[in-house]
Amino acid sequence: MKLDARFESKNGKLYALKTGEKADTGAFIPFDSGVLSGVSSESAEAEAQRFSQDRGKILAVYVSHRAAEISENTYDEMYLAALRVFLKGIETYGAYAVAVPLSDGDDAERLTQAMCHTARRIKDCASVIGFALPDSLTESEAAAFIDAMSEKHSHYVYFSNRHTGTALVTYAVAGLR
């Protein structure tokens, strides 16, 4: 299922395509998706309900490489399914998400592959605006990350506070500034 873009990046800022309104990227609400490891769909939905009053707000959903990829090219499909349920849940409440990969110091290519696999599992989640670029990536690795993701997910916007480029949106996470 291919989703249409709901947001776009212009000069380092995020805008809603429907209204043209600038989105607030200065205080994303943090959520550690690691709590979804090994949980049922019901538990994932209960986690989403915590954000039922956050219509229009954006969550920074931290996705650990090690949570998504158990070992090389072996993915935790139960975790990814729970992540999808969570993201579909916040979608029903009108909240949005930016997936923030946590690299755990791993190889950039494996991290990119794991996040591409993650994106495939959450591809029908309209709540997902895009992905943040891990600070650990070099400029060329960041470009490779975006290229790999864009092959199948051209609607995503990319976020970074370290990497340069007018197509990248800067952001801050509430409580972590």
Show the residue positions of the predicted features.
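N-terminal carbohydrate-binding accessory modules
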Residues: 1-60, 147-151, 169-177
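Arginine residue identity/basic-tract feature
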Residues: 6, 50, 55, 66, ...
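General structural signal for secondary-structure boundaries
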Residues: 40-44, 107, 162
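Aromatic-lined substrate-binding rim segments of carbohydrate-active enzymes
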Residues: 41-103, 143-157
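Amphipathic alpha-helical segments in well-structured domains
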Residues: 83, 111-115, 142
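Active-site region of glycoside hydrolase catalytic domains
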Residues: 92-95, 116-177
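Short glycine/proline-centered loop/turn elements that form peptide/ligand docking sites
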Residues: 101-107, 135-138
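Active-site-adjacent "subsite" loops/lids of carbohydrate-active enzymes
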Residues: 104-120
